[in-house]
């Protein structure tokens, strides 16, 4: 591993390696002017109160105004939030993000009447509205999906009250983000020669991938030791998150926050529970993988600071960003020329914020807009960074195609399908890399990475999902989620998932405190279901070619025009069945067989 250099400040990053945020608004002043105009829109929206049941024309006029306000709000929110993520210490953009949130909450309150009024329209009357006003068909999917949750919609006054509490409900996530990304400082990690390496949330995984075990252990103990010193605070934040989810779920007459969260995107709770059950049935493969890793590393004890380092050190190499882009472009050839033309456009026109800088948000994400998507990376030159590029551009092109082919109100796909688009790219990249090498060591190195993807995406994310489900149950039963409660449950699950060959210590019991997804409302299971669907789809694309690509691009262009389950069925995968998860885990077993064979001495 190359020695990590000092993390640059934002102004030291070349312009070509920063996203083109000016494509949204040329200046902060232009953004301020547009935000002021958006704030005025609440008067227009509020003027429709009490009138949505009058006629099809009135309902259409309101929906049109609502759609336009949401489209403008999307651009405004993206600008200030992307700016804030460039340097989380920058008070200007933190303030702008707060100002935007205030306007967004006011707009939500101003149109809080719409859901109860739309729910109050009878089926017969709404059918007449469509007949009288053909333009209203544009919003049929949206209105149908909204009315699906009629039993969980409150009176206009109650809806307004809940809407006005929206900003307050975001407090746990906001506070956690400020603590994790801006305020937490970690001691430098020290390598076997005594050299110091900057330790941040962003550099942690790169340090854990080092072949230097002393450095890995130092980074691991310094990160989790620091988190442990804040465990009372982080537990209180996560407890508050679960309390607010419980409050809103009960207010809307759901039995649990779990049911409320999944119903919001029309995904059956059985899909979540089937995932956990199916993974439990395949836990022997994960334990076998852990045993193999322990054997290949040649250690007496396998610790959690040993799980990221590549097993074949002499194949490990730095991948320059330009090379990573070309490799991803070449690997996605099975998706066709149209797909790759859009991909190259994104590479060439600064959709991506590439490198880490001081204060930059850790991790990676893609944010879609009607202008073009924005992708945040913290690229470090590892094989994992290359896969992250493929992953996030999968999200980006999904957003681009949905925005191109759907009305704004139908373009915003749900997370359940989002992870399919990103992970399919990763699966195609892996197939491409494996297909290019006959070298035994390089093949073993790549298969190791593929196995690590299964471990990290299917097993690990399912463990996160099970943790989230279990602590949600505790909160629902009135239990306070103290640090001791959270650590005990997290440690128990690590012992279950990693098995007897892994040392599960008190450090890893603190890992829940560095997982931001626990503030995303039963989100993480979709990484595992998405990975399973993506494995199935990537194999269909490689096997069948054009017909499968046509179905897949239709899926990517679908936005939220159908339920997520139906969109995936159209692409060729049924996620109500355990079959896709079983298929993916069967492949994991086959790869494990080959890895054992390739590394047998």
Residue ranges and their predicted role:
Residues 317-319, 370-390:
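Short pre-active-site segment immediately N-terminal to the catalytic Zn-binding motif
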Residues 317-319, 352-371:
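Catalytic zinc-binding patch centered on the HExxH motif and its immediate surroundings
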Residues 330-341, 367, 395, 399-407, ...:
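Conserved helix-loop functional segments at active or binding sites
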Residues 296-334, 340-341, 398, 445, ...:
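Long, K/E/R/D-enriched contiguous segments that form extended
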Residues 253, 380-400, 422, 427, ...:
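Active-site recognition of the HExxH zinc-binding catalytic motif
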Residues 1-314, 598-601:
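A well-structured
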Residues 413-442, 450-452, 456, 530:
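Post-HExxH zinc-binding segment in Zn-dependent metallohydrolases
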Residues 12-15, 22, 26, 118, ...:
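C-terminal, non-catalytic "cap/extension" segments appended to globular domains
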């Amino acid at each position: 591993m190359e020695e990590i250099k000092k993390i640059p400040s934002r102004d030291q990053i070349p312009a070509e390696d920063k996203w083109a945020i000016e494509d949204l608004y040329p200046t902060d002043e232009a953004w301020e002017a547009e935000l002021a105009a958006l704030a005025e829109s609440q008067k227009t929206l509020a003027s429709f109160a009490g009138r949505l049941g009058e006629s099809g024309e009135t309902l259409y006029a309101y929906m049109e105004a609502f759609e336009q306000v949401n489209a403008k709000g999307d651009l405004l929110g993206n600008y200030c939030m992307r700016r804030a993520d460039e340097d989380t210490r920058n008070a200007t953009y933190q303030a702008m993000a707060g100002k935007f949130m205030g306007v967004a909450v006011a707009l939500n309150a101003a149109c809080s009447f719409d859901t109860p009024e739309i729910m109050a329209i009878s089926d017969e009357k709404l059918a007449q509205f469509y007949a009288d006003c053909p333009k209203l068909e544009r919003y049929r999917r949206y209105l149908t999906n909204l009315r699906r949750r009629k039993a969980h919609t409150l009176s206009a006054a109650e809806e307004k009250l809940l809407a006005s509490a929206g900003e307050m409900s975001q407090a746990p996530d906001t506070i956690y983000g400020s603590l994790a990304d801006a305020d937490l400082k970690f001691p430098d990690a020290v390598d076997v020669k005594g050299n110091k390496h900057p330790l941040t949330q962003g550099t942690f995984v790169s340090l854990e991938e080092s072949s230097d075990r002393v450095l890995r252990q130092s980074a691991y103990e310094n990160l989790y030791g620091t988190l442990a010193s804040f465990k009372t605070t982080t537990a209180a934040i996560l407890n508050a998150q679960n309390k607010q989810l419980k409050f809103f779920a009960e207010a809307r007459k759901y039995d649990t926050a779990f049911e409320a969260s999944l119903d919001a995107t029309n995904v059956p709770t059985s899909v979540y529970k089937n995932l956990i059950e199916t993974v439990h049935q395949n836990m022997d493969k994960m334990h076998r993988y852990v045993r193999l890793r322990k054997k290949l590393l040649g250690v007496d004890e396998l610790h959690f600071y040993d799980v990221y380092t590549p097993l074949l050190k002499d194949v490990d190499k730095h991948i320059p960003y330009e090379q990573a882009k070309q490799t991803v472009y070449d690997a996605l050839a099975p998706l066709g020329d149209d797909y790759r033309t859009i991909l190259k456009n994104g590479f060439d026109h600064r959709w991506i914020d590439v490198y880490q800088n001081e204060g930059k948000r850790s991790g990676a994400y893609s944010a879609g807009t009607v202008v073009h998507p924005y992708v945040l990376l913290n690229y470090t030159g590892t094989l994992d960074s290359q896969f992250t590029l493929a992953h996030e551009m999968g999200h980006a092109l999904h957003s681009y195609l949905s925005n191109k082919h759907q009305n704004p109100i139908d373009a915003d796909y749900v997370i359940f399908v989002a992870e399919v688009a990103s992970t399919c790219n990763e699966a195609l990249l892996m197939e491409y890399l494996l297909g290019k090498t006959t070298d035994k060591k390089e093949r073993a190195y790549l298969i190791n990475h593929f196995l690590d993807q299964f471990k990290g995406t299917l097993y690990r994310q399912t463990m996160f999902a099970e943790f989230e489900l279990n602590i949600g149950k505790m909160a629902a039963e009135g239990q306070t989620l103290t640090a001791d409660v959270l650590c005990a449950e997290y440690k128990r699950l690590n012992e279950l998932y990693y098995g007897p060959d892994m040392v599960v210590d008190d450090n890893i019991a603190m890992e829940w405190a560095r997982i931001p997804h626990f503030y995303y409302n039963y989100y993480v299971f979709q990484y595992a279901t998405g990975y399973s669907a993506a494995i199935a789809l990537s194999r269909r694309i490689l096997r069948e070619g054009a017909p499968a690509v046509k179905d897949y691009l239709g899926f990517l262009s679908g936005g939220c025009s159908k339920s997520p389950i139906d969109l995936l069925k159209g692409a060729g995968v049924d996620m109500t069945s355990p079959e896709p998860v079983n298929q993916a885990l069967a492949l994991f077993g086959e790869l494990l067989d080959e890895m054992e064979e390739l590394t047998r001495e």
